[in-house]
Amino acid sequence: MADIDNKEQSELDQDLDDVEEVEEEETGEETKIKARQLTVQMMQNPQILAALQERLDGLVETPTGYIESLPRVVKRRVNALKNLQVKCAQIEAKFYEEVHDLERKYAVLYQPLFDKRFEIINAIYEPTEEECEWKPDEEDEISEELKEKAKIEDEKKDEEKEDPKGIPEFWLTVFKNVDLLSDMVQEHDEPILKHLKDIKVKFSGAGQPMSFVLEFHFEPNEYFTNEVLTKTYRMRSEPDDSDPFSFDGPEIMGCTGCQIDWKKGKNVTLKTIKKKQKHKGRGTVRTVTKTVSNDSFFNFFAPPEVPESGDLDDDAEAILAADFEIGHFLRERIIPRSVLYFTGEAIEDDDDDYDEEGEEADEEGEEEGDEENDPDYDPKKDQNPAECKQQ
């Protein structure tokens, strides 16, 4: 046994001597290549990987395990960084307050354009020929002959039809074109929304708590007496003292609707149901009429009330979360770009954005799948342990 051990030791010493001689002859680049190869071999060894994992698990058993293992003096410096982060959040809050001031300032500049939009939609103003000229995209351009033919056809149709005023059902069409809004609109809501003339957004004044109001302007109708229905959203743009690191810009904290003065028998947010009840003793049957809530877009103006404690049940929380999303979408997208949602162009742009991301993901998946299905594919050839992407 001793002779075998001595022989193995001798062979090992010889191997080491050979390695030393080779290393003396190799260039620095060759040494790097060998180091890479050795690293690859080590990382493919299950025993080595298991040992490394065990060591890492012991060092960092929880996400904060490493932080807890730091010396006290280092922890103090980390706390200093956290205090700096809080100050960054406070500056960011100030930034968003100034953005809100800019929104209010530019809302005044946008308003004359929105006023003219309102007048065109509601047949108060008839745009001139020059204002109606629109150069289509290159792919939409057609020959002069086809243009003339289309013009003649349009004139014939206009003669056959009664002359429409403004742009009929403008806002209803916008709502029906947008999934987020069309899901709210029921069939019994549509006749009412045909009377919707305009939607406006009003920002809180300087020095007031951050908020905005959505105004829905209606023409006189047979359903309610209100000329304007409002929805007010209260916002906060400051870090929460209890969790300052969660601050990520202004957030909607609550909302208030308005009372709709429905005309008799026209309240679409309620419905009457009839229920038969059988008397247990006598066996007689009676019909009971009961009024219950009904799905409707106009429930948007009666959001759940948030108690002072702030505690809400799951249903109320879900309703408010959806409500906030809708309010934000109306303010940021629908009101400024309504004509593009009316024509569907804004929706196509949104779909294109999602399609591009989806196509990229699909292409990546196809490439990976092709490699795996290729019998000649060798995953080791793709490994490059020398590269390290910087985050």
From Swiss-Prot:
Carries keyword Acetylation? yes
Motif NAP1L motif positions after renumbering to this chain: 125-150
The record's section on InterPro entries has:
NAP-like_sf, NAP_family
Which SUPFAM superfamilies has this protein been placed in?
Answer: NAP-like
Q: Which residues carry this modification: N-acetylalanine?
A: A2
Oligomeric and partner information: Homodimer. The dimer binds strongly and sequentially to single and double H2A-H2B heterodimers. Interacts with ERCC6; this interaction increases ERCC6 processivity. Interacts with RAD54. Interacts with SETD1A.
Protein name from the UniProt record: Nucleosome assembly protein 1-like 1
Organism of provenance: Pongo abelii (Sumatran orangutan)
